[in-house]
Amino acid sequence: MKQKITDYLDEIYGGTFTATHLQKLVTRLESAKRLITQRRKKHWDESDVVLITYADQFHSNDLKPLPTFNQFYHQWLQSIFSHVHLLPFYPWSSDDGFSVIDYHQVASEAGEWQDIQQLGECSHLMFDFVCNHMSAKSEWFKNYLQQHPGFEDFFIAVDPQTDLSAVTRPRALPLLTPFQMRDHSTRHLWTTFSDDQIDLNYRSPEVLLAMVDVLLCYLAKGAEYVRLDAVGFMWKEPGTSCIHLEKTHLIIKLLRSIIDNVAPGTVIITETNVPHKDNIAYFGAGDDEAHMVYQFSLPPLVLHAVQKQNVEALCAWAQNLTLPSSNTTWFNFLASHDGIGLNPLRGLLPESEILELVEALQQEGALVNWKNNPDGTRSPYEINVTYMDALSRRESSDEERCARFILAHAILLSFPGVPAIYIQSILGSRNDYAGVEKLGYNRAINRKKYHSKEITRELNDEATLRHAVYHELSRLITLRRSHNEFHPDNNFTIDTINSSVMRIPRSNADGNCLTGLFNVSKNIQHVNITNLHGRDLISEVDILGNEITLRPWQVMWIK
């Protein structure tokens, strides 16, 4: 393993990663091995379902947000989820946590490490490794601006005359931001995402050592899943797209080797919101990069299927899903703290259909974020909306909203891989326009924070949409977790019965089969399927004949 680490370092750095740097790294890894005593789960299974949430999601009058979350989780969520993905809980200055001031601390206004440790006693933990950039308010960046020894090349200074037209831009913002140094010179620094998020310079061995320290800290604090945020942008080469470069993949291989060495069983998940073929490249050879990749094409394809009442595009894509090894799987989701990405649709749907979907959602109140293209044009890259409101129309009844929403999540839970559900989804949340107006950015539409008493009251009120969604979705998750056919590694096929109905059989090594039927239309569907007998686990109705009737937006799990 140590030889593998050394080989990757040589490929990335050549002679610039010196024997002194290597000794520092080895010392840190040996120290981390002694500190990391918690045993990881050996392999994922059907019981693994992840909750995605902010650490400050709930507040109360007498406790800080993290202990308040722990109380809420214990009462409402612990029996449903196996893992909690706590979005960045470190001190931050912008982007709701993704502009990190200090990687090693918990934001004091949210709580402390002890609160996270307590959560880890009743749940597996997933942390964000915000590896591409850090806050302009951080000590590291202040030291850089002050030209302190050891920080000379922590960030990336570029001559503004450099031709950077080939660089992939995820935002409609300037790539370079000018900053004044202590000696009054001006440096133009690489800022992929915003002028408050300064890209780290991985050409510097000191940056690599500092970020490995961060990773080892998270492993010692109990992270069993580690999300590599915006990882595709880590290595920069002017004159190229600066995304998915070979040395980015080599750094991931290096981090994988380090994790396998000090905390075997830890799962690396890469976050690359890009077209599907680029996304799956982060599996590497199947045993040397990510254990899981975010299934970014799933949210917009499920949305497209329900909006169009047509499953053909979703099925055509899913029929080609292949994994490089049994050591890899998908990290499936429908909603997250970000919007619904459109880039993962490109290559799967014609651009005209993507724009048609965007326009339809805009008419229903969704907000759209745009990116600049190298040719000077701009394209929509993200729809900002709760998944609840994305699936339904303004005039829809709550009963219809709930049915469409549960249908979509049944598809999610039926797919191979580990499913993740965003806190706003399990809470049945609608668009938060007041939050957008107050905070001034589109993504706030799906990031509302709650007083714990307020949300508890709504969940207890049987007349509310929240109550219906929480209980129906909880029941669905519980069913999935108790049936081995849904194991991420088990056999998966998908086909269309007609343009509005699809079938997903899942079978295990014992030969047991569970078949999902999904009607994505507003119409009753009568389908003829031979030799499909058993009991629908959801409605608890026996299926005896060949003709099966599906109500609008109905799902069956037949076993």
Curated annotation (Swiss-Prot):
Report any Pfam family annotated for this entry: Alpha-amylase
What SUPFAM superfamilies does the annotation carry? (Trans)glycosidases
Which EC numbers does the record give?
Answer: 2.4.1.352
Q: Which GO terms describe its molecular function?
A: glucosylglycerate phosphorylase activity
The active site consists of 229 (nucleophile)
Q: Answer yes or no on keyword Metal-binding.
A: no
What does gene deletion cause? No visible phenotype when grown on glucose.
Entries under Gene3D superfamilies matching the protein? Glycosidases (3.20.20.80), Oligo-1,6-glucosidase, Domain 2 (3.90.400.10)
Its domain of life?
Bacteria
User: What biological-process GO terms show up in the record?
Assistant: carbohydrate metabolic process
Kindly report, in one word, the top-level EC class recorded for this enzyme.
transferase
What the entry lists under InterPro entries is as follows: GGa_phosphorylase (IPR033746), Glyco_hydro_13_cat_dom (IPR006047), Glycoside_hydrolase_SF (IPR017853), O16G_dom_2 (IPR045857), Sucrose_GGa_phosphorylase-rel (IPR016377)
Q: What keywords are assigned to this protein?
A: Carbohydrate metabolism, Glycosyltransferase, Transferase
Which reactions are catalysed by this chain?
A: (2R)-2-O-(alpha-D-glucopyranosyl)-glycerate + phosphate = (R)-glycerate + alpha-D-glucose 1-phosphate
The record's annotation in CDD domains points to: AmyAc_Sucrose_phosphorylase-like_1
**Does the keyword section mention Coiled coil?**
no
Could you tell me which PANTHER family the record lists for this protein?
A: SUCROSE PHOSPHORYLASE
Role according to the record: Catalyzes the reversible phosphorolysis of glucosylglycerate into alpha-D-glucose 1-phosphate (Glc1P) and D-glycerate (also called (R)-glycerate). May be a regulator of intracellular levels of glucosylglycerate, a compatible solute that primarily protects organisms facing salt stress and very specific nutritional constraints. Cannot catalyze the phosphorolysis of sucrose. Does not act on other sugars such as alpha-D-galactose 1-phosphate, alpha-D-mannose 1-phosphate or beta-D-glucose 1-phosphate; in vitro D-erythronate can substitute for D-glycerate with a much lower efficiency.
Q: What family classification does the UniProt entry report for this protein?
A: Belongs to the glycosyl hydrolase 13 family. Glucosylglycerate phosphorylase subfamily.
According to UniProt, the name of this protein is Glucosylglycerate phosphorylase
This protein's encoding gene: ycjM
